[in-house]
Amino acid sequence: NTARSRPRQCGTQSFAAAAPLTWNVTLATAAEEHSRSMANNNYFDHKDRDGRTPGDRAELAGYSAQLIGENIAAGQDSVRKVVDGWVASPGHCANLMNPQFQELGAAYAVDPKSDSGIYWTAMFGTP
């Protein structure tokens, strides 16, 4: 929510400060499952190993959404580094700043045998 608290330029898009997101446990569960899948199966993608999209995974977890977005990251060892990377990336920044999103669930998972070691997922939703 700190990133949303002030106006931002995300690539060529300008965003006003956005309202804080509300934590959603269902989105957090879906985010944790995706992070764990990426870590344990050593891949990095918005689609899971079964080809499910973020919207598919949110629905499977029980989240009924009008709008879903997702940011993923890998290898960063702190939340600050992850968010800084997302703010610097136009598409990820646009998800963070999108005023239509109302809820957030996020998680990370670690597998030292994977290429990146740690995998992060943030899921944004509008019920």
Regions inferred by a protein language model and the residue ranges of each:
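Disulfide-stabilized extracellular recognition modules
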Residues: 65, 69, 73-127
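Short, surface-exposed glycine/acidic/tryptophan-bearing loops
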Residues: 25-77
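Alpha-helix boundary/capping residues
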Residues: 3, 34-38, 61, 86, ...
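Short, hydrophobic secondary-structure boundary micro-motifs
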Residues: 13-16, 46-48, 95-96
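A short alpha-helix/helix-coil micro-patch that ends at or immediately precedes a cysteine
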Residues: 1-40
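Bacterial peptidoglycan biogenesis and beta-lactam-recognition machinery
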Residues: 10, 40, 44, 92-94
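Short glycine-/small-residue-rich flexible loop motifs, especially phosphate/cofactor-binding loops
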Residues: 1, 55, 93
